[in-house]
Every structure is written in structure tokens, then in C-alpha cells.
Amino acid sequence: RSLMKNAFNLGVGEILTEALDELGIGRDRKLEITRAVIRSDYEVTAPYQCVYALPDRAGAANVYLRSELGDVDWTELEEESGTLLAEVLTDEEIDVLGPRIEAMDPISSTSWPLERAAADEDFVYFISAGVDPEKRGSGAFRRLFTPFLEYADEHGLACYLDCYTERLEQLYGHFGFETVERRSIDAFPIEERLMVRRAR
């Protein structure tokens, strides 16, 4: 599986960037890689109306409506994003990160909503969403997140997302998401929480 953004979700990303310590890579380069992960994802999903930002740039989200992807398979976009990311990484970084990402595959899937939805069912999937740390507590996340939920409710659509921390699980729970499955593997001390919000 290609290097891809989902592997850099909170929790998973920490484990992967720790792996870069083996190469003596410092904080600045780790930050550069993390930004490249997000940028590569945005670059391939933006043509499908998946990238959104608040007018004041306090927050941004990568969210797709299944029907807007048309005939494109989500895994194709992941592969394309991974290819773009690989162009930024050195061979040594790929050698260190690649095996870890492969090993984490069972707890970093972004195609699980397709396993739960009917073949012709439209839905909203949150790939990533974040707020400028300096804007936390300002209501920026609610301003970013709520319009997607309102759209889903108006159109009778389920929303899907996954996260890796109890704090985020609780946050999304306040917006009506329920954890439907937890995934973990012995090799890494993290747990993926698969969450669904039904239309209201």
C-alpha cells in the first residue's frame, strides 16, 4: 500500500515520525513531511470538491461526498496521493516509513465506509479536519464541521470518520457520532475508532 495521509492521523503519525528518529531526522523535517502528507492529499482530492477551509483560515477539512467521486475509486486517489508524497521523501525515509505503514494497514483503512454502505448509497466521509491551534476554543471547529452535518441531515446521508484518541472520540460524540468498531494490532499501542453518524 502506498504512503498516504491516513497513516499520519493523530496517534499513528506520532508513531511514524518517531520511526524517523532512526535516521536522526529533526523536528523541522518531520513537520515538513507531515505538511507534505496533507498537501498531497489535498492536491488529489480538491478536483472532487473535497477540500474546504473557513474564510478566516482558522480550520480546514478534507471531506468527500461519495457521489462526487463519480467513477473514481477512493483507493486510486490514495495511491495518487502516496505517489506525490513519495516524491518528497528520501529513499531512506521511504525505507523506514514504508514497512511501518504496511504493518499499520489494518488500523489505518480509509475504505471501511464502503464496506458498510450499500452499493448505491451516498454518504459523507471525513478524511481529515483540523483547526489552527491558536484558534482552539474559538468555535472554529464547530463552524468548520457543522455545515457538513447539516447537509447530510438535509439529504438523509450517513457520515463516517475515524480517529485514534479518546479526546477526539468524545469530541465527535458531541456531534452525534457513535463508535461502531474499534481496531487494534499488537505491534502498535493505538486503537482506531470507526465512527458513524446517522442522518437526523
Q: What positions do the PLM features span?
A:
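Helix-loop element at the rim of GNAT/NAT acetyltransferase active sites that forms part
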Residues: 2-29
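Active-site rim helix/loop that mediates acceptor-substrate recognition in acyltransferases
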Residues: 23-50
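Conserved beta-hairpin
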Residues: 43-65
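Short hydrophobic/aromatic beta-strand or adjacent loop that forms the aromatic wall/cage
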Residues: 58-59, 190-195
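Conserved acyl-donor/pantetheine-binding loop and adjacent beta-alpha core of acyl/acetyltransferases
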Residues: 60-130, 136, 186
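Conserved GNAT acetyl-CoA-binding A-motif
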Residues: 123-124, 151-164
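Conserved acetyl-CoA-binding loop-helix of GNAT-fold acetyltransferases
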Residues: 131, 137-150
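Conserved active-site alpha-helix within GNAT-family acetyltransferase domains
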Residues: 154-156, 165-182, 188
